[in-house]
A protein has these predicted regions:
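Low-complexity, intrinsically disordered or signal/transmembrane-proximal segments
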Residues: 2-5, 30
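Flexible, compositionally biased loop and terminal segments
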Residues: 11-14, 18-197
Length: 197
Protein backbone atom coordinates (compact mmCIF):
# COMPACT_ATOMS: atom_id res chain seq x y z
CA UNK A 1 0.00 0.00 0.00
CA UNK A 2 0.91 3.66 -0.15
CA UNK A 3 1.64 5.14 3.26
CA UNK A 4 -0.45 8.11 4.21
CA UNK A 5 -3.27 7.63 1.70
CA UNK A 6 -6.72 7.89 3.21
CA UNK A 7 -9.55 6.09 1.42
CA UNK A 8 -12.39 8.49 0.60
CA UNK A 9 -15.46 6.63 -0.65
CA UNK A 10 -16.85 8.18 -3.80
CA UNK A 11 -13.45 9.64 -4.75
CA UNK A 12 -11.82 6.49 -6.11
CA UNK A 13 -10.02 3.42 -4.79
CA UNK A 14 -7.12 3.95 -2.45
CA UNK A 15 -4.96 1.63 -0.40
CA UNK A 16 -5.81 1.37 3.27
CA UNK A 17 -3.82 3.43 5.73
CA UNK A 18 -3.21 3.14 9.47
CA UNK A 19 -5.54 6.10 9.92
CA UNK A 20 -8.51 4.37 8.26
CA UNK A 21 -10.12 3.05 11.41
CA UNK A 22 -9.70 6.41 13.14
CA UNK A 23 -11.34 8.63 10.54
CA UNK A 24 -14.93 8.65 9.37
CA UNK A 25 -15.47 8.15 5.66
CA UNK A 26 -16.21 11.27 3.61
CA UNK A 27 -18.59 9.95 0.99
CA UNK A 28 -22.07 10.24 -0.35
CA UNK A 29 -22.97 7.38 1.98
CA UNK A 30 -21.40 9.07 5.02
CA UNK A 31 -22.22 12.74 4.56
CA UNK A 32 -22.85 13.82 8.14
CA UNK A 33 -19.85 15.92 9.12
CA UNK A 34 -21.29 16.50 12.59
CA UNK A 35 -20.46 12.89 13.48
CA UNK A 36 -16.73 13.35 12.89
CA UNK A 37 -16.00 14.69 16.35
CA UNK A 38 -17.61 14.72 19.74
CA UNK A 39 -19.72 17.70 20.82
CA UNK A 40 -17.06 18.74 23.34
CA UNK A 41 -14.39 18.88 20.60
CA UNK A 42 -12.44 15.74 21.51
CA UNK A 43 -9.48 14.96 19.28
CA UNK A 44 -10.35 12.99 16.14
CA UNK A 45 -7.15 10.94 16.35
CA UNK A 46 -6.46 10.52 20.07
CA UNK A 47 -4.06 7.61 19.51
CA UNK A 48 -1.95 9.38 16.88
CA UNK A 49 0.56 11.92 18.21
CA UNK A 50 0.46 15.31 16.43
CA UNK A 51 3.97 14.84 15.00
CA UNK A 52 2.85 11.59 13.29
CA UNK A 53 -0.16 13.14 11.58
CA UNK A 54 0.00 13.99 7.89
CA UNK A 55 0.79 17.59 6.98
CA UNK A 56 -0.07 17.07 3.31
CA UNK A 57 -2.99 15.02 2.02
CA UNK A 58 -3.40 14.46 -1.72
CA UNK A 59 -6.53 13.02 -3.30
CA UNK A 60 -6.99 11.90 -6.88
CA UNK A 61 -10.66 12.49 -7.57
CA UNK A 62 -11.40 9.46 -9.67
CA UNK A 63 -14.35 7.13 -9.85
CA UNK A 64 -17.24 9.49 -9.06
CA UNK A 65 -18.96 8.79 -12.38
CA UNK A 66 -18.54 5.03 -11.97
CA UNK A 67 -19.82 5.31 -8.38
CA UNK A 68 -23.02 6.91 -9.72
CA UNK A 69 -23.42 4.40 -12.54
CA UNK A 70 -23.19 1.47 -10.10
CA UNK A 71 -26.15 3.05 -8.28
CA UNK A 72 -28.11 3.71 -11.49
CA UNK A 73 -27.62 7.47 -11.12
CA UNK A 74 -26.47 9.92 -13.79
CA UNK A 75 -22.67 10.33 -13.87
CA UNK A 76 -23.00 14.01 -12.95
CA UNK A 77 -24.67 12.99 -9.69
CA UNK A 78 -21.49 11.14 -8.79
CA UNK A 79 -19.50 14.29 -9.47
CA UNK A 80 -21.89 16.33 -7.31
CA UNK A 81 -21.47 13.84 -4.48
CA UNK A 82 -17.70 14.06 -4.96
CA UNK A 83 -17.89 17.83 -4.41
CA UNK A 84 -19.94 17.22 -1.29
CA UNK A 85 -17.28 14.74 -0.08
CA UNK A 86 -14.68 17.47 -0.66
CA UNK A 87 -16.47 19.75 1.78
CA UNK A 88 -16.32 17.01 4.38
CA UNK A 89 -12.69 16.25 3.59
CA UNK A 90 -11.70 19.93 3.83
CA UNK A 91 -13.42 20.23 7.21
CA UNK A 92 -11.62 17.09 8.44
CA UNK A 93 -8.27 18.46 7.28
CA UNK A 94 -8.89 21.70 9.20
CA UNK A 95 -9.89 19.77 12.33
CA UNK A 96 -6.84 17.50 12.08
CA UNK A 97 -4.40 20.36 11.53
CA UNK A 98 -3.40 19.28 8.01
CA UNK A 99 -1.55 22.16 6.33
CA UNK A 100 -1.87 21.17 2.64
CA UNK A 101 -4.68 19.45 0.75
CA UNK A 102 -4.00 18.77 -2.93
CA UNK A 103 -7.00 17.75 -5.00
CA UNK A 104 -6.37 16.29 -8.43
CA UNK A 105 -9.72 17.38 -9.87
CA UNK A 106 -9.56 17.29 -13.64
CA UNK A 107 -6.76 15.85 -15.75
CA UNK A 108 -6.03 16.91 -19.31
CA UNK A 109 -7.17 13.43 -20.39
CA UNK A 110 -10.67 14.26 -19.07
CA UNK A 111 -11.27 16.46 -22.14
CA UNK A 112 -12.08 13.20 -23.98
CA UNK A 113 -15.36 12.90 -22.07
CA UNK A 114 -18.69 13.61 -23.82
CA UNK A 115 -19.39 17.34 -24.19
CA UNK A 116 -22.50 17.34 -21.93
CA UNK A 117 -20.46 15.78 -19.11
CA UNK A 118 -17.63 18.29 -19.68
CA UNK A 119 -20.11 21.17 -19.53
CA UNK A 120 -21.56 19.81 -16.30
CA UNK A 121 -18.08 19.37 -14.77
CA UNK A 122 -17.06 22.93 -15.66
CA UNK A 123 -20.35 24.22 -14.23
CA UNK A 124 -19.69 22.26 -11.02
CA UNK A 125 -16.19 23.76 -10.77
CA UNK A 126 -17.55 27.26 -11.22
CA UNK A 127 -20.39 26.61 -8.76
CA UNK A 128 -17.93 25.25 -6.18
CA UNK A 129 -15.78 28.38 -6.48
CA UNK A 130 -18.78 30.67 -5.97
CA UNK A 131 -20.61 28.71 -3.25
CA UNK A 132 -17.57 27.77 -1.15
CA UNK A 133 -15.84 31.16 -1.34
CA UNK A 134 -17.44 32.56 1.81
CA UNK A 135 -16.62 29.45 3.85
CA UNK A 136 -13.04 29.41 2.57
CA UNK A 137 -12.62 33.04 3.67
CA UNK A 138 -14.28 32.44 7.08
CA UNK A 139 -12.11 29.39 7.74
CA UNK A 140 -8.86 31.15 6.70
CA UNK A 141 -8.25 28.63 3.89
CA UNK A 142 -5.88 29.53 1.07
CA UNK A 143 -6.63 28.27 -2.44
CA UNK A 144 -4.20 27.79 -5.31
CA UNK A 145 -4.94 26.44 -8.76
CA UNK A 146 -2.33 24.31 -10.53
CA UNK A 147 -2.39 23.24 -14.16
CA UNK A 148 -2.89 24.68 -17.61
CA UNK A 149 -5.40 27.45 -18.17
CA UNK A 150 -5.85 26.59 -21.85
CA UNK A 151 -9.22 25.12 -22.78
CA UNK A 152 -10.77 26.16 -19.47
CA UNK A 153 -13.99 28.19 -19.82
CA UNK A 154 -13.52 31.92 -19.20
CA UNK A 155 -16.28 32.00 -16.57
CA UNK A 156 -14.65 29.16 -14.57
CA UNK A 157 -11.25 30.88 -14.79
CA UNK A 158 -12.80 34.14 -13.60
CA UNK A 159 -14.36 32.48 -10.53
CA UNK A 160 -11.17 30.54 -9.76
CA UNK A 161 -9.13 33.75 -9.97
CA UNK A 162 -11.56 35.58 -7.64
CA UNK A 163 -11.33 32.82 -5.06
CA UNK A 164 -7.53 32.59 -5.28
CA UNK A 165 -7.21 36.36 -4.87
CA UNK A 166 -9.61 36.55 -1.90
CA UNK A 167 -7.80 33.72 -0.12
CA UNK A 168 -4.22 34.66 -1.05
CA UNK A 169 -3.10 35.60 2.48
CA UNK A 170 -4.91 32.80 4.34
CA UNK A 171 -2.87 30.24 6.24
CA UNK A 172 -4.97 27.71 8.19
CA UNK A 173 -5.09 25.19 5.34
CA UNK A 174 -3.71 25.49 1.80
CA UNK A 175 -5.97 23.79 -0.75
CA UNK A 176 -4.25 23.18 -4.09
CA UNK A 177 -6.63 22.35 -6.94
CA UNK A 178 -4.93 20.54 -9.82
CA UNK A 179 -7.07 21.29 -12.85
CA UNK A 180 -6.24 20.46 -16.48
CA UNK A 181 -3.03 18.71 -15.45
CA UNK A 182 -1.44 15.56 -16.78
CA UNK A 183 1.70 13.74 -17.75
CA UNK A 184 1.16 14.25 -21.47
CA UNK A 185 0.56 17.96 -21.03
CA UNK A 186 3.72 18.25 -18.94
CA UNK A 187 5.75 16.44 -21.63
CA UNK A 188 4.41 18.80 -24.31
CA UNK A 189 5.28 21.82 -22.15
CA UNK A 190 8.78 20.45 -21.49
CA UNK A 191 9.35 19.83 -25.22
CA UNK A 192 8.22 23.38 -26.04
CA UNK A 193 10.54 24.80 -23.40
CA UNK A 194 13.47 22.80 -24.77
CA UNK A 195 12.70 23.86 -28.34
CA UNK A 196 12.59 27.54 -27.39
CA UNK A 197 15.81 27.38 -25.30
Amino acid sequence: GHAGQLPIDGCGRRDRSPFESSLPSASAEHENVAETSTPDGDDLLPDVPPEARPQHVAIIMDGNGRWAQRRNLPRIEGHRRGVKALRTTTELCVRLGVKYLTLYCFSSENWKRPQPELNALMNLLEQYMVEERGELVRENIRVSVLGRREQMPASALREMDKTVELCREHSRLHVCLAINYGGRAELVDAARNLASA
